[in-house]
């Protein structure tokens, strides 16, 4: 009888102590800004969840401080990467060609029309979301991004602008963030909620 009571108490204790951990897994630990904005250089250099190695007049060199929990998954035959730490679902590669920023809407619209991975709410990431992918070091001699993602996209557009001067981009090839007007790739994202 004592043995049964002890086991019963241990099982109940485990269940009660595990409840907060299970709930924490369901909710993202970090919520990143998901609406586009006109960002100044100072506001970009003051972003949360980053470590800056060097600031310059175009942006900064640095990396995310977020501890990611990536899960690679196939949905309807389409690959996705889910980040349980931020509650974001990423396209694992994105566009195979780089393009001007004013052409990104057509590419995203086509992806949504096809219903990639069963969803029609894909978009360009905000700078906060895109910079969250920057790693502190090159991975396997490749870019500054986790190898769960395709490393071909060396620089990606965001939906955030820098006044009339340009658009904010993240460069996985150099581990930096900067504004520009040249051609970049697209790595679409969607919020899980």
Predicted features by range, described:
Residues 1-9:
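Bacterial N-terminal signal peptides that target proteins for export
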Residues 20-123, 127-193:
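Glycine-aromatic-enriched surface loops/turns that form tight recognition elements
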Residues 8-18:
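Bacterial N-terminal signal peptides
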């Amino acid at each position: 009888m004592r043995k049964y009571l002890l086991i019963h108490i241990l099982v109940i204790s485990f269940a009660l102590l595990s409840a907060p951990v299970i709930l924490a897994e369901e909710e993202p630990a970090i919520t990143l800004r998901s609406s586009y904005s006109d960002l100044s250089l100072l506001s970009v250099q003051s972003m949360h969840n980053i470590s800056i190695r060097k600031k310059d007049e175009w942006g900064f060199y640095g990396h995310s401080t977020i501890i990611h929990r990536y899960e690679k998954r196939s949905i309807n035959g389409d690959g996705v990467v889910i980040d349980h730490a931020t509650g974001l679902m990423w396209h694992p590669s994105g566009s195979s060609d780089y393009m001007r920023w004013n052409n990104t809407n057509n590419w995203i619209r086509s992806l949504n029309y096809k219903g990639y991975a069963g969803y029609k709410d894909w978009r360009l990431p905000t700078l906060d979301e895109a910079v969250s992918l920057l790693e502190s070091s090159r991975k396997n001699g490749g870019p500054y991004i986790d190898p769960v993602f395709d490393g071909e996209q060396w620089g990606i557009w965001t939906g955030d602008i820098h006044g009339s001067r340009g658009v904010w981009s993240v460069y996985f090839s150099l581990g930096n963030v900067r504004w520009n007007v040249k051609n970049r790739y697209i790595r679409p994202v969607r919020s899980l909620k």
